[in-house]
Amino acid sequence: MSSGSWSHEVAVNVAAGRMFKAAMLDWHNLGPKIVPDFIAGGSVVSGDGSVGTIREIKINNPAIPFSYVKERLDFVDHDKFEVKQTLVEGGGLGKMFECATTHFKFEPSSNGGCLVKVTASYKILPGVADESAKAKEGITNHMKATEAYLLANPTAYV
């Protein structure tokens, strides 16, 4: 079993607060609307959106080797636009990973947009290839889809 981590940054032309709300806090609702070819649905399994909340995202893409992801919110800072979440079920847990956490931080930039900083930490099970490049691509796609939606809908998530 090997441990690993990676960091990734995505620049977007939407304010940090709007991106944080749409891409993190409400992704289980927004994702299926804006990327239905990837996300079939989402829901809050337990909790109210604060620390300890568990959310489920159902995957609708045969290229992904799992059909859903359940994540627990471990840290939420509405003022600094930060979220840390832990994979608790699905998403390759037990098949690809022993454990995985992801930390997102949305930092305002001088152009009115923001820089999304992501750090993932994980333990890969023996014999499983590290696919961090695919994970980074997925994060970029997630943020760019959210950005496109928010630019097209300027009153959403204000």
From Swiss-Prot:
Keywords: Cytoplasm, Pathogenesis-related protein, Plant defense. GO terms for cellular component: cytoplasm; nucleus. GO terms for molecular function: abscisic acid binding; protein phosphatase inhibitor activity; signaling receptor activity. Induction: By wounding and elicitor treatments. It is found in: Cytoplasm. Its main location: cytoplasm. Disulfide bonds: none annotated. CDD domains: Bet_v1-like. One of its GO terms (biological process) is abscisic acid-activated signaling pathway. Belongs to the BetVI family. This is Pathogenesis-related protein 1.
